[in-house]
Amino acid sequence: MSKTYAEINDRIKKGEVVVVTAEEIIDIVDEKGVKKAAQEVDVVTTGTFSPMCSSGAFLNFGHAKPRIKVQKAWLNGVNAYAGLAAVDLYVGATELPEDDPLNKVFPGEFKYGGGHIIEDLVSGKDIRLKAIAYGTDCYPGKELDTWIKLEDLNEAVLTNPRNAYQNYNCAVNLSDKTIYTYMGTIKPKLGNATYCSAAQLSPLMNDPEYKTIGIGTRIFLGGGVGYVIWQGTQHNPTVARTEGGVPKGGAGTLSVIGDLKQMVPDWLRGVSFRGYGATLAVGIGIP
Protein backbone atom coordinates (compact mmCIF):
# COMPACT_ATOMS: atom_id res chain seq x y z
CA MET A 1 0.00 0.00 0.00
CA SER A 2 1.44 3.36 -1.01
CA LYS A 3 0.83 6.63 0.80
CA THR A 4 1.76 10.09 -0.41
CA TYR A 5 3.61 12.65 1.70
CA ALA A 6 0.53 14.87 1.43
CA GLU A 7 -1.68 12.15 2.90
CA ILE A 8 0.71 11.49 5.76
CA ASN A 9 1.14 15.22 6.50
CA ASP A 10 -2.64 15.58 6.59
CA ARG A 11 -2.86 12.79 9.16
CA ILE A 12 -0.13 14.50 11.19
CA LYS A 13 -2.13 17.76 11.23
CA LYS A 14 -5.25 15.89 12.34
CA GLY A 15 -3.37 14.07 15.10
CA GLU A 16 -4.17 10.71 13.53
CA VAL A 17 -0.73 9.69 12.34
CA VAL A 18 0.69 6.33 13.47
CA VAL A 19 4.44 6.44 14.07
CA VAL A 20 6.64 3.51 15.10
CA THR A 21 10.38 2.92 15.20
CA ALA A 22 12.22 0.68 12.77
CA GLU A 23 12.65 -1.73 15.68
CA GLU A 24 8.94 -1.81 16.53
CA ILE A 25 7.84 -2.33 12.91
CA ILE A 26 9.55 -5.73 12.84
CA ASP A 27 7.14 -7.24 15.38
CA ILE A 28 4.17 -5.52 13.75
CA VAL A 29 5.02 -7.05 10.37
CA ASP A 30 5.60 -10.47 11.96
CA GLU A 31 2.19 -10.28 13.63
CA LYS A 32 0.07 -8.66 10.92
CA GLY A 33 1.97 -9.11 7.68
CA VAL A 34 3.47 -6.53 5.35
CA LYS A 35 0.20 -5.39 3.75
CA LYS A 36 -1.69 -4.85 7.01
CA ALA A 37 1.30 -3.15 8.63
CA ALA A 38 1.60 -0.76 5.68
CA GLN A 39 -2.08 0.10 5.98
CA GLU A 40 -1.91 0.83 9.71
CA VAL A 41 1.50 2.51 10.05
CA ASP A 42 2.19 5.90 8.46
CA VAL A 43 5.76 6.67 9.51
CA VAL A 44 8.70 4.48 10.50
CA THR A 45 11.51 6.31 12.28
CA THR A 46 15.19 5.41 12.10
CA GLY A 47 18.11 6.80 14.03
CA THR A 48 21.68 6.57 15.19
CA PHE A 49 23.67 8.07 18.07
CA SER A 50 27.36 7.37 17.93
CA PRO A 51 30.78 9.03 17.75
CA MET A 52 31.52 10.68 14.40
CA CYS A 53 34.92 12.31 13.95
CA SER A 54 33.76 13.99 10.73
CA SER A 55 31.88 16.64 12.71
CA GLY A 56 32.30 20.29 13.53
CA ALA A 57 30.64 23.69 13.81
CA PHE A 58 30.88 26.98 11.95
CA LEU A 59 30.65 29.96 14.31
CA ASN A 60 30.25 33.67 13.61
CA PHE A 61 30.92 35.68 16.78
CA GLY A 62 30.35 39.19 15.39
CA HIS A 63 32.68 42.17 15.16
CA ALA A 64 34.63 43.48 18.12
CA LYS A 65 35.84 47.05 18.70
CA PRO A 66 38.25 47.60 17.08
CA ARG A 67 37.34 45.21 14.30
CA ILE A 68 39.61 42.24 13.83
CA LYS A 69 40.29 39.84 10.97
CA VAL A 70 41.16 36.73 12.93
CA GLN A 71 44.34 34.94 11.91
CA LYS A 72 44.47 32.36 14.69
CA ALA A 73 41.90 31.54 17.36
CA TRP A 74 41.37 29.27 20.35
CA LEU A 75 38.21 28.23 22.18
CA ASN A 76 39.00 27.13 25.74
CA GLY A 77 42.50 26.49 24.46
CA VAL A 78 41.32 24.34 21.53
CA ASN A 79 42.44 25.58 18.12
CA ALA A 80 39.65 26.91 15.89
CA TYR A 81 40.27 27.24 12.17
CA ALA A 82 40.20 30.90 11.13
CA GLY A 83 40.89 30.72 7.40
CA LEU A 84 37.43 32.02 6.53
CA ALA A 85 35.98 35.54 6.77
CA ALA A 86 37.01 38.03 9.46
CA VAL A 87 35.04 36.64 12.42
CA ASP A 88 34.05 33.20 11.14
CA LEU A 89 35.56 30.17 12.85
CA TYR A 90 35.34 26.43 12.39
CA VAL A 91 35.90 24.08 15.31
CA GLY A 92 36.42 20.43 14.43
CA ALA A 93 35.31 17.65 16.75
CA THR A 94 38.76 16.05 16.91
CA GLU A 95 40.79 19.24 17.47
CA LEU A 96 42.81 19.24 20.71
CA PRO A 97 44.35 21.90 22.97
CA GLU A 98 47.90 22.86 22.03
CA ASP A 99 49.09 21.89 25.52
CA ASP A 100 47.43 18.46 25.52
CA PRO A 101 50.05 15.78 26.35
CA LEU A 102 48.53 13.60 23.60
CA ASN A 103 50.12 10.15 23.69
CA LYS A 104 53.36 11.22 25.34
CA VAL A 105 52.19 9.20 28.34
CA PHE A 106 50.57 6.29 26.57
CA PRO A 107 47.68 5.78 26.35
CA GLY A 108 46.68 9.43 26.42
CA GLU A 109 43.39 10.46 28.01
CA PHE A 110 42.34 13.26 25.62
CA LYS A 111 39.98 14.72 28.19
CA TYR A 112 38.93 17.78 26.18
CA GLY A 113 38.67 18.64 22.51
CA GLY A 114 36.51 20.16 19.82
CA GLY A 115 33.62 17.81 20.50
CA HIS A 116 33.55 18.96 24.12
CA ILE A 117 33.56 22.60 22.97
CA ILE A 118 30.42 21.92 20.93
CA GLU A 119 28.75 20.15 23.86
CA ASP A 120 29.67 23.04 26.17
CA LEU A 121 28.19 25.55 23.72
CA VAL A 122 24.82 23.78 23.53
CA SER A 123 24.92 23.40 27.33
CA GLY A 124 24.95 27.20 27.63
CA LYS A 125 28.44 27.40 29.11
CA ASP A 126 30.81 30.33 28.72
CA ILE A 127 33.66 29.65 26.29
CA ARG A 128 36.89 31.65 26.35
CA LEU A 129 37.74 33.01 22.91
CA LYS A 130 41.28 34.17 22.27
CA ALA A 131 42.32 35.45 18.86
CA ILE A 132 45.25 37.18 17.22
CA ALA A 133 45.60 39.01 13.90
CA TYR A 134 48.17 40.95 11.89
CA GLY A 135 45.99 44.05 11.50
CA THR A 136 44.79 45.83 8.36
CA ASP A 137 43.39 49.26 7.56
CA CYS A 138 39.84 47.92 7.65
CA TYR A 139 40.48 45.45 10.49
CA PRO A 140 43.01 47.17 12.77
CA GLY A 141 42.51 44.88 15.79
CA LYS A 142 45.38 42.53 16.61
CA GLU A 143 44.23 40.76 19.77
CA LEU A 144 40.96 39.60 21.29
CA ASP A 145 40.40 37.86 24.61
CA THR A 146 36.76 37.51 25.63
CA TRP A 147 34.04 35.09 26.68
CA ILE A 148 31.24 33.92 24.41
CA LYS A 149 28.08 31.84 24.77
CA LEU A 150 25.99 30.15 22.11
CA GLU A 151 23.21 32.70 22.53
CA ASP A 152 25.68 35.54 21.82
CA LEU A 153 26.78 34.18 18.45
CA ASN A 154 25.27 35.51 15.25
CA GLU A 155 25.24 32.04 13.75
CA ALA A 156 26.31 28.58 14.87
CA VAL A 157 25.93 25.74 12.39
CA LEU A 158 26.65 22.08 13.09
CA THR A 159 28.05 20.26 10.07
CA ASN A 160 28.73 16.57 9.53
CA PRO A 161 30.55 15.96 6.24
CA ARG A 162 30.02 12.26 7.01
CA ASN A 163 27.49 10.53 9.24
CA ALA A 164 24.95 7.69 9.38
CA TYR A 165 27.43 5.21 7.91
CA GLN A 166 25.64 2.32 6.25
CA ASN A 167 26.71 -1.03 7.72
CA TYR A 168 29.91 -0.01 9.46
CA ASN A 169 32.72 -2.22 10.77
CA CYS A 170 33.16 -4.50 13.75
CA ALA A 171 36.65 -4.45 15.26
CA VAL A 172 38.55 -7.27 16.96
CA ASN A 173 42.17 -7.66 18.01
CA LEU A 174 44.13 -10.81 17.19
CA SER A 175 47.43 -9.54 18.60
CA ASP A 176 48.92 -10.10 22.04
CA LYS A 177 48.58 -6.51 23.21
CA THR A 178 45.73 -4.08 23.87
CA ILE A 179 45.23 -1.52 21.12
CA TYR A 180 43.56 1.89 21.34
CA THR A 181 41.48 3.01 18.36
CA TYR A 182 38.59 5.21 17.23
CA MET A 183 36.49 2.08 17.80
CA GLY A 184 37.52 2.12 21.44
CA THR A 185 39.89 -0.05 23.44
CA ILE A 186 40.24 -3.48 21.84
CA LYS A 187 41.54 -6.26 24.04
CA PRO A 188 44.11 -8.81 22.85
CA LYS A 189 43.38 -12.33 21.59
CA LEU A 190 39.73 -11.66 20.74
CA GLY A 191 39.08 -10.38 24.26
CA ASN A 192 36.22 -8.20 22.99
CA ALA A 193 34.58 -6.91 19.84
CA THR A 194 33.47 -3.34 19.26
CA TYR A 195 31.08 -2.19 16.58
CA CYS A 196 29.37 1.00 15.51
CA SER A 197 25.94 0.46 13.98
CA ALA A 198 22.36 1.13 15.01
CA ALA A 199 21.41 -2.20 13.39
CA GLN A 200 17.68 -2.32 12.59
CA LEU A 201 17.37 1.36 13.57
CA SER A 202 20.13 2.46 11.17
CA PRO A 203 18.76 5.01 8.67
CA LEU A 204 20.53 3.82 5.53
CA MET A 205 20.10 0.14 6.38
CA ASN A 206 16.37 0.84 6.17
CA ASP A 207 16.82 2.65 2.86
CA PRO A 208 19.60 0.53 1.36
CA GLU A 209 19.26 1.86 -2.19
CA TYR A 210 18.71 5.52 -1.18
CA LYS A 211 15.19 5.75 -2.59
CA THR A 212 13.78 7.86 0.28
CA ILE A 213 16.65 9.67 1.98
CA GLY A 214 18.42 12.30 -0.11
CA ILE A 215 19.31 15.96 -0.56
CA GLY A 216 16.80 18.10 1.33
CA THR A 217 15.52 15.36 3.62
CA ARG A 218 14.52 16.97 6.91
CA ILE A 219 15.94 15.18 9.94
CA PHE A 220 16.32 15.23 13.71
CA LEU A 221 19.88 16.41 14.38
CA GLY A 222 21.40 16.82 17.80
CA GLY A 223 17.99 17.48 19.33
CA GLY A 224 17.04 20.08 16.72
CA VAL A 225 16.12 20.21 13.05
CA GLY A 226 18.67 19.44 10.36
CA TYR A 227 18.86 18.53 6.70
CA VAL A 228 20.68 16.12 4.44
CA ILE A 229 22.75 18.31 2.10
CA TRP A 230 24.79 15.82 0.07
CA GLN A 231 26.23 12.36 0.04
CA GLY A 232 28.74 12.03 2.85
CA THR A 233 32.47 11.67 2.40
CA GLN A 234 33.61 8.10 1.69
CA HIS A 235 30.14 7.37 0.24
CA ASN A 236 30.51 4.10 -1.67
CA PRO A 237 27.24 2.71 -3.03
CA THR A 238 28.98 0.16 -5.28
CA VAL A 239 30.01 -2.35 -2.59
CA ALA A 240 28.87 -5.97 -2.81
CA ARG A 241 25.26 -6.44 -1.71
CA THR A 242 22.84 -9.22 -0.82
CA GLU A 243 20.01 -10.20 -3.15
CA GLY A 244 17.82 -7.82 -1.16
CA GLY A 245 20.17 -4.91 -1.79
CA VAL A 246 21.69 -4.72 1.69
CA PRO A 247 25.41 -3.83 1.54
CA LYS A 248 27.85 -6.41 2.85
CA GLY A 249 30.32 -3.75 4.00
CA GLY A 250 30.57 -0.03 4.68
CA ALA A 251 28.65 1.73 1.93
CA GLY A 252 26.56 4.90 1.89
CA THR A 253 27.01 7.98 4.08
CA LEU A 254 25.18 11.26 4.57
CA SER A 255 26.37 14.85 4.85
CA VAL A 256 24.09 16.80 7.19
CA ILE A 257 23.72 20.32 8.59
CA GLY A 258 21.65 22.05 11.26
CA ASP A 259 21.24 25.08 13.52
CA LEU A 260 23.37 24.48 16.62
CA LYS A 261 21.20 26.91 18.59
CA GLN A 262 18.28 24.46 18.40
CA MET A 263 20.31 21.54 19.71
CA VAL A 264 20.70 20.08 23.20
CA PRO A 265 23.54 18.30 25.02
CA ASP A 266 21.47 15.13 25.39
CA TRP A 267 22.13 14.49 21.69
CA LEU A 268 25.55 16.12 21.24
CA ARG A 269 28.25 14.73 23.52
CA GLY A 270 31.97 15.28 23.56
CA VAL A 271 33.74 11.92 23.68
CA SER A 272 37.26 10.93 24.74
CA PHE A 273 38.85 7.76 23.37
CA ARG A 274 41.84 6.63 25.40
CA GLY A 275 44.97 6.44 23.29
CA TYR A 276 43.20 7.88 20.23
CA GLY A 277 41.69 11.33 20.71
CA ALA A 278 38.54 13.39 21.11
CA THR A 279 35.39 13.34 19.00
CA LEU A 280 31.66 14.10 19.09
CA ALA A 281 28.70 11.74 19.45
CA VAL A 282 25.83 13.00 17.29
CA GLY A 283 22.19 11.97 17.52
CA ILE A 284 20.38 11.65 14.19
CA GLY A 285 16.81 10.59 13.48
CA ILE A 286 15.29 10.17 10.02
CA PRO A 287 11.66 9.25 9.30
What are these regions (language model features)?
Residues 2-287:
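Anaerobic metallocofactor- and corrinoid-dependent redox/one-carbon enzyme cores
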